[in-house]
Structure formats: structure tokens, C-alpha cells
Amino acid sequence: MSVRIEHDTFGEIEVPADKYWGAQTERSKRNFPVGKERMPIEVVYGFAQLKRAAALANFDLGKLSEAKKDAIVYACDQILSGELDEHFPLVVWQTGSGTQSNMNVNEVVSYVANMYLKDHHSDESIHPNDDVNKSQSSNDTFPTAMHVALYQEVETKLEPALKLLRNTLKEKEDKFDSIIKIGRTHLQDATPIKLGQEISGWRYMLDRCETMLSESKKHILNLAIGGTAVGTGINAHPEFGDKVAQYISENTGYPFVSSENKFHALTAHDEVVQLHGTLKALAGDLMKIANDVRWLASGPRAGLAEISIPENEPGSSIMPGKVNPTQCEMLTMVAVQVMGNDTVVGFASSQGNFELNVYKPVIMHNTLQSIYLLADGMETFNNNCAVGIEPIEENIDNYLNQSLMLVTALNPHIGYEKAAQIAKKAHKEGLTLKESAIQTGYVTEEQFEAWIKPEDMVDPH
């Protein structure tokens, strides 16, 4: 392997000649061969947005020459294009401030910027610390990049997937509004409900999650940049944080602002905890929806079989013809993983000892993973399951007509105890509810027909 020699304050080190990173990245790569979880590229892009904005701000404040500013902006734009992804090899499991990833970005930006300056016949050169990292610390850059990445992924991935599934459920809700089925509570028969009403509950869960997500993501717009090492802003111009937030906003289209309290921004990540709490709530709702769907589709001959779902692949390696609710199973596993991630994010956020939380990479990793899993899970579940949900009306009608809980409609006319006697007699003697009611003498056939109307029971008001 061809190498070149790079150096840092620890001395010289060999770096692969075809890679753009420098000495500190190479040391981290060697010192932390832990796991396979790479630092998400979206965090790198968040850093690139930040370094780009910092160069513009430092130029405005007289801290950086125009040539250096242009070179850094060019390098950051190259990173944002996705063409340099291979030059960011570090894993999540590194220093808790994310210093190695900050330096990885600084070194790659410096390398590309120097090539740019050389191509433009400039005598200037870019240093990863003195120029790319000017007015910054890893302690305020990593949380800034984290917030930029999280907000963007919620906006571009999670919310569209949530809306997609929500809209599909709304279509099913409206389509099945005339189908009356038996309701169930405690896994036991209950009073009737429309299939559309049942699905409306699922849909409204997603409506509420969409509202909560919209609210919680607002707090992610606060950026730590400008706090530098411990929140005091040492080595940064007083206007630096505001200017960087402004430039990031202009380039992303999102209204980021500089946090009003940098001490909080460095040592606490409660905004991310709140955001992930919303992700956990969404995961819980998706778990419920997926479980309901697979129970209602259970069968085909010895289950509930009130709805059918798409058959996407063989379900068993030994039982021919078996088809399983695989999309539901996928979504419930996604939900479990997100719930576990929430525990990690909550505990990690609590570890802000003194002026700095040093669990930032794992907070970032778990939150982004939850966003990706939920977004992909909802989209896949929607396209391969939800859109194909159809009622099996023969079974639905059969369960409804056999239900003893229709007796509830007699309560206002004959009282709870007599109605209970009718239901128990029907169950014990294998009678229909109508047969039992007439045999007890509590109601006539005409009264039963007038009072037991499922269509009235699902819309009593």
C-alpha cells in the first residue's frame, strides 16, 4: 500500500496515500478498532454545513482571508455532494466529545481546500486546526453537527414516511366506514364498531405523533456553536455563533439559531431526549398497529381472519403454502429496537459531568438509527402491507351475528342484570342471543328486532 507521511503534535504517522484524512484521523482509526458502527455520514454532512458556515462567518469577522474562505467552502460543498464519503472511516466508539470525527472533517476539508488553492495558483495553505476549526472546539461543533443532521433527517426522511402511512390509513378508514364488526376489549368480545372507526384510531395515533414530532424538532434548531470549549466562547468572536447559525440556515433552508445558553448546549442534550421520546411514542403506536393488523389477519382458517393482507413471500421452509405477516413482524422489531435506543439516549444524556457531556456519539448514533428504522419501517409496511388491507366480510358478519355483547343495547330497556342473564343463557345453552332473549320472556321478538341494531350501536349519537 502506498503511503504518505502526515504529522500532528504526537509526531509523524503513515497515512494511505489515496485517502484525504490526516494524522489525527489515522491515529483514531488505529486506536479505536471497536465494532462496525461507522459515524453516520449524515453527521459528516452536518459538520460540512458547519465548517462551510464557519468559514463564511470568520471571513465576515476579518478572521479568514477570502482565498481561504473560498477554498474551505469549495471543500465543504464537495463533501456535501457525497463524492468524498470514503474519506470518513471512523467508528462511533471514540472519544465522547466526537473530537476524532471533528478532526476527520477538518483534515479532509484542509486536504481538499489545499488542492483547490494549488489549482488556483495561491500561495496560501489551509491548516485543519488554525483555519478549518478556527473559532471552534469539538465540544461545540459535534453537538451542532448533531442537531443539523437530526433536524434534516426528521424533515426529509421520517416525516414523509409518517405522512405516507397516515394517509394510507385514512384512505382505509374512509373506504371501510360502512363495515360493522365486533369490537374487542381485554381480548374478549365487546360491542360493535365500524372497521373504519377501528382504523381511525390507528390513523389518529399517527396524527398525534406528527404533531408531537413537529413540536419536539423545534428545539433541535438551537445550536451550540459559539460556546467553544466550555461554553464561554473563548477564541471566538461574540458574533460568531449567530453568524454561523445564519449561514447554516441559508444553506439548508431550516431556521437554525445559536443557543442562548452555551453552557447548557455543551453539557446537556435534553432536546434530543425529548425528540427521541417522541420517536419512542411513535414506536409504541406502530407496535400496536402492527399487532392489531396481524391478529385481525390471523388464520386463514383457524384465526380471526377479519382482514386479508398482501402475501409477499413464502412463510415457512417446512410448511408448504404457509404465508406469514412478515411486514408486521418487521415493524414490531423496529419498535422494540427504538424503545431500547431510547433507554441509551436517556441515560447517555444524563452523563453531562460538569461542563461537557461525553456521550455525544452514542446519543447521535442511536437517535439517527431510530429515525432511519422508523422511516424505512413505515414506508415498507405501508407499501407492502397497509395498502393491501382488505376486509373479509363473511367472517366479519359471522362474528358480529354470533356476538353476545350485542345484548348491551338492551341495558336501557330491561336493565343490566336481566341483559346479563340473557347473554349467559345464550352462551351456556348454545342459543343465539335472540333465542335466549325471547325464551327468558324479558323481551318480545319485535322488541329485540327494534332494540338490537348494530348500525345504531356504532353511531349512538
Swiss-Prot record:
Substrate binds at residues 97-99, 127-130, 137-139, 185, 317, 322-324. The record marks E329 as: Important for catalytic activity. The keyword Acyltransferase does not apply. Pathway: Carbohydrate metabolism; tricarboxylic acid cycle; (S)-malate from fumarate: step 1/1. CDD domains: Fumarase_classII. GO terms for cellular component: cytoplasm. It is found in: Cytoplasm. It holds the Pfam family FumaraseC_C. GO terms for biological process: fumarate metabolic process; malate metabolic process; tricarboxylic acid cycle. The active site is at H186 (proton donor/acceptor), S316. Keywords: Cytoplasm, Lyase, Tricarboxylic acid cycle. InterPro entries: Fum_hydII, Fumarase/histidase_N, Fumarase_C_C, Fumarate_lyase_CS, Fumarate_lyase_fam, Fumarate_lyase_N, L-Aspartase-like. It catalyses: (S)-malate = fumarate + H2O. One of its GO terms (molecular function) is fumarate hydratase activity. Its main location: cytoplasm. Its EC number is 4.2.1.2. Belongs to the class-II fumarase/aspartase family. Fumarase subfamily. Homotetramer. There are 2 substrate-binding sites: the catalytic A site, and the non-catalytic B site that may play a role in the transfer of substrate or product between the active site and the solvent. Alternatively, the B site may bind allosteric effectors. Involved in the TCA cycle. Catalyzes the stereospecific interconversion of fumarate to L-malate. This is Fumarate hydratase class II. The lineage of its organism: Bacteria, Bacillati, Bacillota, Bacilli, Bacillales. The gene is fumC.
